[in-house]
Amino acid sequence: MATLNGTSNGHGKMLSLTLQIWRQKNSKTKGRMEEYKIKGVSTEMSFLEMLDMLNEQLIKEGKDPVAFDHDCREGICGMCGAMVNGYAHGPDEATTLCQTHMRSFSDGDTITIEPWRAKAFPVIKDLAVDRTSFERIIQSGGYISVGTGGTPDANAIPIPKEAADRAMDAAQCIGCGACVAACPNASAMLFTSAKISHLANLPQGQVERHLRAANMIRAMDELGFGNCTNHGECEAVCPKEIKMENIALMNREYFGAMM
Amino acid sequence: MATVLDSKVPSGPLGEKWEKHKFESKLVNPANRRKFSVIVVGTGLAGASAAASLGDMGYKVKAFCFQDSPRRAHSIAAQGGINAAKNYRNDGDSVHRLFYDTIKGGDYRAREANVHRLAEVSVNIIDQCVAQGVPFAREYGGLLDNRSFGGAQVSRTFYARGQTGQQLLLGAYSALSRQIHLNNVEMHTRTEMLDLVVVDGRARGIITRNLVTGAVERHSADAVLLCTGGYGNVFFLSTNAQGCNVTATWRAHRRGAFFANPCYTQIHPTCIPVHGEDQSKLTLMSESLRNDGRVWVPKAKGDKRRAEDIPEAERDYFLERKYPAFGNLVPRDIASRNAKEVCDEGRGVGEGQAVYLDFAASIARVGENVIRDRYGNLFDMYAKITAENPYKTPMQIYPAVHYTMGGLWVDYNLQSTIPGLFVLGEANFSDHGANRLGASALMQGLADGYFVAPYTIGNYLGGTKLDPVTANAPEFGAVENDVNERVNKLLSIKGNKTPLAFHKELGKIMWNECGMARSKDGLESALKRIPELREEFWNNIKVTGEAGEFNQQLERAGRVADFLEFGELFAKDALVREESCGGHFRVEHQTEEGEAKRDDDNFAHVAAYEWTGKSGAQTRNVEQLIFENVKLTQRSYK
Ligand SMILES: Cc1cc2nc3c(=O)[nH]c(=O)nc-3n(C[C@H](O)[C@H](O)[C@H](O)COP(=O)(O)OP(=O)(O)OC[C@H]3O[C@@H](n4cnc5c(N)ncnc54)[C@H](O)[C@@H]3O)c2cc1C
Ligand code: SF4
Ligand code: FES
């Protein structure tokens, strides 16, 4: 880019920061917090760009860069995430870590950065965790059982706009795992209920609704996620503002399955 | 010697080719499908839909992606919508019109028969997605809603708020998850394909690296599908996700698959401008904003006043001025080029590389609430990134690399020049010519995966006598050795420059010389500097860590190494294509008014490059494009 050679970092202010970061070589070794100093962090940078900068610095110093997951960097793929000063995805409301910007911090701040912590999310390295358990929950029933082809015309079944909107509200979950990380019980209720609610709000999802709820809840329990005791931390940290009322709906679907 | 490329387009009238081809295709009976194994690399829209469909049909499928879940593929980021010729609006849409718009939008550089098939199956896609529970936007009567997109005069775009790609991918992902649960698909996440294995001239497997443990592994099959997305990240800064790469298709190219039209790149006009040297990606602001936003810059050079202090008379609404008929809604390539032009004249705003997208007039006309209803999520995203309020001050935007029309060459069956290797989605070159219309990539990915490949792969497997091959075959050992050698080489150089630094440097060359305006001099300079940078890379790269562990530096280094070869082919293709068409603008080839000037006599063809053993020394083969159903005209939007 032409401006890349020009004034670096636009109109941002520069920060000097102390970072306390969880370092863990792999799932078998024990981890620990390490401290790093970093200067010249523009307030225009995203949080992950700050970590990129730190990594370039660490490599130059002959140290191992910090591993962290990310891909889209625009808040939609659900790949990124870490506990920042104790908050899942950092200080900003309804914002993923990749969309968090350094202007939310001040010069001289100390920032602690740790991975999601939950039995069902073992650490792979540093800030990267294994979320295969989320895959298993979806595989256990998070779908409508249709094959490819032979489906009716898309407008054959009208769906009230309100129902479609409710389904869409729940379907926005990005599967990041922040809800689990923030929950004192490491419960996956918010994530699971979002999928159940998305499908239960649509006529196409009706046929399997009770079986789906039963299967997904069973998978969730077997995978080592905890129970919901109504702390509400999940809703508070969710970057997509998924609501706890989905959990209530899931419980109704589940009891329907038991009847 | 140039190879003759056979597109295998079936004979007969355009509208009957696909039906006829399906009827004539060989079938594999359901009981026998279990005996065939298929590898699907990539599980974005194209790959997830293909893997789910093939698994559902009964084939033994192994699927791969480098993220920790198929749900995270780059397709998830698509915002605006998906086209389909449903004609639910009764506004004159039809399969033929969608076909025509796509061919014209692509500046007459795509294959007619493929595009027509795309338009035909587009209607089935929407049915399929609704059955899976994709929550498309609806009207109060409960029927599906539509919006309009650039390059079309009808309203045929289906959408799910500003997250259409997410919802479509989650639909395909749910179908794939079901097939995984039924044991029809074996899913390998956090696994990267590093090479292709060809046995007796046919694609029979891949070599992968497990990104968690570093283990290099062999996988054999009867057919291989590459659904690995586009290569926009050769420019370093783009709207693509960080992991998007050319590795899978490039390695296949080096094993014999022809690479088609590498220089065709789409540069999207409305993205948030670059803010500094440490920026890692650019963010798209949907095309739909141009419905209500007016694009302008100050009339005077170097005018540093705030937007609100510049009086009407001193503003230049350059798109409205130059293209009165289409105004702010000219196609993407034209909007991008004009923004660059005014910035090059010194009239850019902000840091100099930006123009205003101003909603003041629309807000005054329809009210802030209506604008919030239409674009709320985009305005929020803009505010999050820039800390400015676009309801009060105009947005600043600048073009950015967004999509790549080029890709591996495929015939009508989506089969590459290596038998048994099929290529789907953005990874192939097939349907968009030199410029893609908005909302057509999602359509193509799902068309390929749900409705085209399942037939054409059946035809291949049913009609070919394949010897049994296992991963113990010597060919697998040889390719595995190549992969290990390469990985070890990257780690052993221990130079001074990081993979990120090399990637940025390559990106600058690509953007400056192969970006929105390309010249002979610039391209020649790129052709000199890219090999030099590659040479430096292989002597001075610093990759920390080890092969047998989770190593993100090693991942990036491998991808940058391939971009450094690919970039050269890109520049070469752009240099040889002595015309301007769609997203490819050669400054030497423009009309008196500065518009793109095609040369149909000499360039109405696909350029398909063949690896000959050395980077930059590829042979250029040609597939002549035959237009029997549309008339080639110069695009005009005045
Ligand atoms: C910001 C943005 C907005 C867009 N909006 C729209 C829109 O509104 N409408 C529209 O039609 N199009 C849009 N597009 C374009 C469209 O999203 C993409 O072209 C399309 O989704 C590509 O799908 P795909 O399945 O081909 O590839 P991708 O979704 O990119 O998937 C690639 C897959 O391949 C895997 N992969 C890649 N390399 C390897 C490897 N070496 N080994 C193993 N796995 C590998 C990845 O893990 C991933 O699973 C947009 C694009 C962007 C960037
Ligand atoms: S419910 Fe929210 S926090 Fe939990 S996985 Fe989904 S998006 Fe993330
Ligand atoms: S990197 Fe995709 S959501 Fe953050």
Predicted regions span which residues?
Chain A
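Charged, low-complexity intrinsically disordered regulatory segments in eukaryotic signaling
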Residues: M1-Q20
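Eukaryote-biased recognition of intrinsically disordered, low-complexity regulatory segments
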Residues: M14-Y36
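Short strand-turn-strand beta-turns centered on an Asx-Gly dipeptide
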Residues: W22, I38-K39, V84-G86
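Short, contiguous acidic and Ser/Thr-rich linear segments
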Residues: E34-S46
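Ferredoxin-type iron-sulfur electron-transfer modules in oxidoreductases and energy-metabolism complexes
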Residues: M45-D64, D109-M259
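Short, structured protein-protein interaction patches enriched in aromatics and acidic/basic residues
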Residues: A67-M79
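Glycine-rich phosphate/adenylate-binding loop and adjacent beta-alpha elements
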Residues: V84-G108, I113
